């Protein structure tokens, strides 16, 4: 059976490849391969709990805020379990909500316009949507301008962005005044005006389908809808079909009730199961059968030791582990959060993607766009609820305790969890399970493929030099890995090398 290797697979960073077994132009089997050992957990050992937020915040330059906040939540949970901490102040909860909401807007724009949008642009796919063209399209450049505004907003609270320093266990290390909050709100409103009104979505869809453009309805909204229309016309609803199992840690906590705007739970067997934090934690395990790690690096992440490499495993093919919930693979990300919330604004996934809970390449894009609009409409409310005269930092925070804690969080890519074991003020054990592990990990010991490995089966490969549908499926899961792409053919030779795409570029590379 012919074999194709695509390595790396995304437009930034690298360290992920996919090997496909193809027969009669259709993918029969896929292996998702993470190519780099990281071991960030090991660096935290022997340090005070507060240090973990500083260290793990550097795990990723994209999800920088998310790891920092998740680690802070793990430390806070451990301290509360030890009986030495009562929880962060109300202002800290609201500001974390607002900051993560701003991050969602920024990251969703990065994904839709820079990471996956070019796959549906005129320059890459001949769709006629030249506003999406990388580097030259008006929509692409407008998104970059508005992403910058959101990063500036995050920097006002965190001191800098990426890698802010203001968010710490116990709350916020700075005390934003009314003028700072107003400045952040002003930047968010500028981006909101670029996006346009949520209620205009049906009209904008009709405009895009008719080749019309009304900037008064929001330039950003027009371009996002263009991506969705181009994807629908390209048949994205018929590729990347997953098992329709979803999991979310939930996010955006109400400081008064503890309710989550995007709820915690799973979707399986056609129904939503809302869950407590303890129920979620109890259900999660990691499998290392096909990972270059020792067996005791897997299992229950609360007690497993930090990852220890094992390079002698003959059948291993990934530095990623295989997370499972109750023994099953689970898809995470915007579609998981909205399915569990039972939200399908304007019935877009139902109408265009074959069903609100259907896992496919198109619905992943639709859900991301829907979520951006949902969260946008909440961020200003969270900012308005902050009282700058009240504290942002708990006065009882201390690193001097013994306890175990778990931080559950939801970066834009999906479920993230940090596990921390503290002994006499020093970290004894640390584990991280990222969204990309859930979606793009390897098989488990039962032979069960990851979400990506399952979703790629059945995708057509019309051209080995340009497997565009395969790339669209991989990128729809927003893997946090990537850059220039190499496509390897059945004879082991590189058939094509893909350079960073510029509009109109074709010689020397294939536009994927």
Q: Which role does the model predict for each range below?
A:
Residues 428:
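Catalytic-core signal marking the mid-to-C-terminal active-site face
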Residues 1-413, 434-512:
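Active-site bordering "gate/hinge" segments
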Residues 421-422:
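Aromatic-rich beta-strand edge motifs centered on tyrosine
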């Amino acid at each position: 059976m012919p074999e194709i290797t695509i390595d790396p697979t995304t437009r930034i960073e690298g360290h992920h490849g996919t090997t496909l077994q193809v027969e009669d132009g259709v993918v029969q089997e896929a292996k998702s391969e993470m190519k780099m050992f990281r071991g960030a957990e090991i660096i935290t050992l022997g340090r005070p709990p507060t240090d973990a937020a500083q260290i793990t915040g550097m795990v990723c330059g994209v999800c920088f805020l998310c790891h920092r906040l998740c680690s802070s939540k793990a430390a806070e949970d451990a301290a509360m379990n030890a009986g030495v901490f009562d929880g962060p102040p109300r202002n800290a909860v609201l500001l974390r909500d607002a900051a993560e909401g701003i991050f969602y807007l920024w990251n969703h724009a990065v994904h839709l316009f820079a990471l996956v949008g070019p796959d549906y642009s005129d320059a890459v796919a001949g769709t006629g949507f030249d506003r999406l063209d990388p580097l030259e399209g008006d929509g692409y450049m407008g998104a970059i301008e508005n992403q910058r505004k959101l990063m500036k907003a995050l920097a006002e609270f965190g001191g800098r962005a990426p890698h802010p320093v203001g968010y710490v266990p116990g709350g916020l290390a700075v005390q934003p005044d009314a003028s700072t909050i107003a400045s952040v709100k002003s930047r968010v409103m500028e981006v909101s005006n670029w996006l346009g009104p949520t209620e205009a979505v049906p009209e904008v869809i009709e405009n895009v389908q008719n080749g019309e453009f009304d900037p008064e309805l929001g330039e950003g909204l027009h371009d996002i809808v263009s991506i969705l229309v181009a994807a629908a016309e390209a048949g994205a609803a018929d590729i990347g079909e997953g098992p329709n199992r979803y999991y979310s840690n939930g996010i955006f906590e109400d400081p008064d009730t503890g309710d989550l705007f995007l709820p915690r739970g799973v979707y399986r067997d056609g129904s939503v199961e809302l869950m407590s934090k303890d129920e979620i934690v109890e259900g999660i395990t990691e499998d290392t059968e096909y990972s270059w790690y020792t067996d005791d690096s897997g299992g229950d992440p609360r007690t497993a030791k930090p990852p220890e490499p094992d390079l002698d495993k003959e059948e291993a093919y990934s530095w990623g582990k295989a997370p499972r919930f109750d023994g099953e693979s689970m898809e995470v990300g915007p579609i998981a959060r909205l399915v569990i919330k039972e939200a399908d604004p304007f019935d877009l996934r139902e109408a265009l993607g074959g069903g609100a809970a259907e896992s496919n390449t198109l619905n992943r894009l639709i859900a991301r766009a829907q979520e951006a609009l949902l969260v946008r409409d909440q961020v200003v409310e969270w900012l308005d609820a902050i009282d700058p005269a009240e504290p942002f930092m708990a006065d009882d925070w201390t690193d001097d305790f013994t306890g175990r804690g778990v931080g559950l969080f939801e970066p834009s890519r999906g479920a993230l969890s940090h596990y921390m074991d503290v002994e006499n003020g020093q970290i004894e054990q640390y584990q991280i399970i990222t969204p990309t592990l859930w979606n793009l990990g390897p098989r488990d010991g039962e032979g069960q493929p990851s979400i990506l490995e399952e979703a790629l089966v059945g995708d057509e490969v019309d051209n080995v030099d340009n497997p565009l549908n395969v790339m669209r499926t991989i990128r729809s899961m927003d893997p946090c890995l990537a850059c220039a792409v190499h496509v390897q053919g059945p004879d082991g030779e590189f058939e094509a090398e893909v350079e960073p795409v510029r509009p109109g570029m074709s010689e020397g590379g294939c536009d994927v």
